[in-house]
Amino acid sequence: MPDTASYKQQKEDFVSNLSGGSVAEINYVTSVAAVAILLWSVLQARQSFFEPYTALAFAVDFLLNVGAILLSVTLYSNSPLLLNLLLIAPAILVFTLPPRSRSPKKKAKIPPNARSNESSGQLDILSTKPFLTNFRGCMLIVTCVAILAVDFRLFPRRFAKVETWGTSLMDLGVGSFVFSAGLVAARPVLREKATGRAGAVGNALSLSSRLVQSLRHSIPLLVLGFIRFLSVKGLDYAEHVTEYGVHWNFFFTLGFLPPFVAIFQSVRKLIPSFAALSLLVGVTYQVLLETTSLKAYVLTAPRTDLISMNREGIFSFVGYLAIFLAGQDTGMFVIPRNLVPKSTASPGAQRNKLLKITAVWGGVWTGLYVLSTNYHYGFGLAVSRRMANLPYVLWVVAFNTIQLLGFAVIDTIFFPAFYNAQDAKTEKEAYTHATSRVMRAYNRNGLAVFLLANLLTGLVNMTVNTLDATPIATMGILVVYSAALTGVAVALDAYNISIKL
């Protein structure tokens, strides 16, 4: 390893003063994940390739859903459309082959005392839809791959986080992580609403109980934030101060979200839409940035006290809160089994309505993003992940809503049986058939895998001179790293272990 002080400075310079790339290129790169799911779906729906789940099936699952994403940000970073074509071509070929008939599974004898539990069972009011698993799994994999890959020269600088203004893959990734968290946070709200508990208690008691519940989620994340802070300072690890500040890190952002979301959940009694709350927060924040000295403070203030030292993390939190609320609003219509409670519409009609609503919201968020950034017809604002301003919020939400739509369309085409299931057992079997084991594993312990990815990233950076690594060495390290993360995730899933942080 080179001289420690100079090498640390080189590492910091390597991720500093970057301006990002185009939104179009980011869309081409991220579409690889959806196209890989398309190929996986064709293999499974037409050939039942992943049943039984053999070592070969796992290898192909890993190569498609992790390997393709890794290639898209490294060796194929300059030609993502070619990589998409290389995935689409075999998908078309497999689709044209005669489908393989699924051999009926031999049912095991069920003890008499277990038959009542094993029998079909009623469908839950909330479902775990395959496209949500694929969406969240892809987001987690891209995030985990990028946080280590960014330290190597093979990873394009235009994909790394920008200094102040601009768009990049990693800027999108951090916002997507928060959006995804908001998406699943809609589940307890929906269950509370469905069971009639939403208005059972007074506002004050409701808020206090929600705040207490939120602390159960916040405290572990805040502890992780302090551990990361102490580790970075204690090990003299390279850090990009203008990303979040001197002491702040992403775990603090995640940790402070639950109590604020609990407050806004009570405000929802007055404004019954998380999307409206998201826009209210985002627009108010942007107005303050434009009409006061807040923007200058966040970007240029001297770091003289605790707040100014962490000004990026503190004020960007407002933007991330808006993203979380928008994700929660999306979850309110993509998670429920029926968009209208007690609806008598057929499963096909419900499914088509979901696609239409998702498409409409994708159009709304995209239109608002264009309005905020267009110089001729809009406000001409620039995206800034550093401040998490309104254009950044709208970009992240628009991208993720459209990405969700893409995964939902793939689901609809290849796995309609899930939506037609009449009982819980049949639905669970259809869900398992329609989802990748790798994706399910990443979903199940997403935050734990993300934490492990951070630990392994630190380990690699402390033991390997990443700046001088050759392309072959880089790919070797990234493949081993990705395989290790995936192996741990799948092993935890195989042993039915869920780590909740």
Swiss-Prot record:
- Which InterPro entries would you find in this protein's record? PIGW/GWT1
Gene Ontology molecular function, alphabetical: glucosaminyl-phosphatidylinositol O-acyltransferase activity
The UniProt keyword set, sorted, is: Acyltransferase, Endoplasmic reticulum, Glycoprotein, GPI-anchor biosynthesis, Membrane, Transferase, Transmembrane, Transmembrane helix
Any Gene Ontology biological process:
GPI anchor biosynthetic process
In the UniProt record, does the keyword Ion transport occur?
no
Q: Which residues are glycosylated?
A: 17, 117, 496
The record's similarity note reads:
Belongs to the PIGW family.
Q: What is this protein called?
A: GPI-anchored wall transfer protein 1
Q: State the species of origin.
A: Gibberella zeae (strain ATCC MYA-4620 / CBS 123657 / FGSC 9075 / NRRL 31084 / PH-1)
Give the encoding gene's name: GWT1
